[in-house]
Amino acid sequence: MASKEIVFDTKARERLARGVDKLANAVKVTLGPKGRNVVIEKSFGAPVITKDGVSVAKEIELEDKFENMGAQMVKEVASKTSDIAGDGTTTATILAQAIYKEGVKLVAAGRNPMAIKRGVDKAVEALVKELGNLAKPTRDQKEIAQVGTISANSDTTIGNIIAEAMSKVGKEGVITVEEAKGLETTLEVVEGMQFDRGYLSPYFVTDPEKMVCEMDEPLILINEKKISSMKDMLPVLEQVAKMNRPLVIIAEDVDGEALATLVVNKLRGTLQVVAVKAPGFGERRKAMLEDIATLTGGRVISEEMGIKLENATVADLGNAKRIVVDKENTTIVDGAGESEAIKARVKMIRAQIEETSSDYDREKLQERLAKIVGGVAVINVGAATETEMKEKKDRVEDALNATRAAVEEGIVPGGGTALVRCCKVLDDVKPADDDEAAGVTIIRRAIEEPLRQIAANAGFEGSIICEKVKEGKDAFGFNAATGEFEDLIAAGVIDPKKVSRIALQNAASVASLLLTTECAIAEKPKEDAPAAPAMGGMGGMGGMGGMY
């Protein structure tokens, strides 16, 4: 085991502080509408240019082990804020730096770090409550577009596309971000329920030019198991043929004799039919088949439920207005399920989303929810080069997360103004002693820092701007994009309340942890072994030029 280097007290905190400063100083130049770019070298390919705080933070590794510890802790603030709120990473980093910087000075002057932490916690709690009072719900598509625009570094195209996507698939809908083939950034909306399984044989297509199978008013047979034998399916097929309606078969698989018979009947024109594999795997497949059954008003033919395929009747089949099946996807439009049953299914999935601790499961459950409730919107991000594509895709994902946060908890004035506006509530915080009061003072000073930095990045003096904003009321603040003081909500400079809240809570949490650090331990750097002496030339090796 390698020997360790141990540093204590002020020395430990100072070295951690140097790392915090290095990371925060690199990240904070990106803040605001006039934020600067950061160029990041890549080990292969072109360097990346970004204005995304979390992308900058992720790239930073420092040589000094203790400084690196400080930097990594603040990196955690940025990542955590990005994961939960989708934006506010730079704000969180700046707040963490400001809280820690002020706190280190006070601890060095003899204040009790635990009491300072208690003061910080009390102040943050009061501010979070006040942010809730300041927040307003998002009223319309225009406000959603404004949130998206600001989070995407003032790109109105991105803001408008996200707002349009939300209006089309609803607040519960799934919006995914993909890379486009061309230069344009476009929105594609899939209405109804879509899943990523296509037809099992190209002979099922009804439009050979587009290679799709389209059916109006089809019946839908949902079978949990594999179908190989035709005799099991014959009774229900005969009933469907008498009704002269198209049939969609969704099963674990259809192969052998069953598939061949369906294809032959389709080609002869006896039966309009298409067979599709069931989506998902294992337990998720069962759940998705139940979703399809609920949406279409059918039943899952499952031996577990006591229904065998040979006993199935038309009453067990689902109905839909239209179904479109291509090589890779199946879309069910306007299923005939009962609204009460659909509502109950939605309620059940929502409860599962609340209970699950796995991010992957949560994402899959949200996708299922969206497929039942609304639909799926895909934002195809286009750009001229791959470097620009990556940067733009990052911005779209940030903006999308920020708009979701705005819809969830409402909006507050942007540009760092909301936190400054909440400052007055700190007068009512009752600290138990002077050291706790010092913790409250740290927060009072730290919450001005994002506004100061936005102003500084735009080429203004932060302190002057901050004082002017403090004199105003409500949404009055500084619009760094225009250099004007105005009503920020009316001007569209708005932030999601959730972003401000999460940024403040995460920053205070990590800064308090660092403040109460009394000892830091890291591996000692390894001494380089002395280089081996250079080998002298080997004599007598001349004259070998003729060898090939």
UniProtKB/Swiss-Prot annotation:
InterPro entries from the UniProt entry: Chaperonin_Cpn60_CS, Cpn60/GroEL, Cpn60/GroEL/TCP-1, GroEL-like_apical_dom_sf, GROEL-like_equatorial_sf, TCP-1-like_intermed_sf
Pfam family, one: Cpn60_TCP1
Main location group: cytoplasm
Protein localization: Cytoplasm
Keyword ATP-binding in record: yes
Principal EC category: isomerase
PROSITE patterns: CHAPERONINS_CPN60
Reaction catalysed by this enzyme: ATP + H2O + a folded polypeptide = ADP + phosphate + an unfolded polypeptide
EC number: 5.6.1.7
SUPFAM superfamilies given in the database record: GroEL apical domain-like, GroEL equatorial domain-like, GroEL-intermediate domain like
Alphabetical GO biological process terms: protein refolding
A cellular-component GO term for this protein: cytoplasm
Molecular function GO terms recorded: ATP binding; ATP-dependent protein folding chaperone; isomerase activity; unfolded protein binding
Classification via NCBIfam families: GroEL, PRK00013.1, PRK12849.1, PRK12850.1, PRK12851.1
Subunit structure and binding partners: Forms a cylinder of 14 subunits composed of two heptameric rings stacked back-to-back. Interacts with the co-chaperonin GroES.
Biological function: Together with its co-chaperonin GroES, plays an essential role in assisting protein folding. The GroEL-GroES system forms a nano-cage that allows encapsulation of the non-native substrate proteins and provides a physical environment optimized to promote and accelerate protein folding.
PANTHER family hit by this protein: 60 KDA HEAT SHOCK PROTEIN, MITOCHONDRIAL
UniProt name for this protein: Chaperonin GroEL
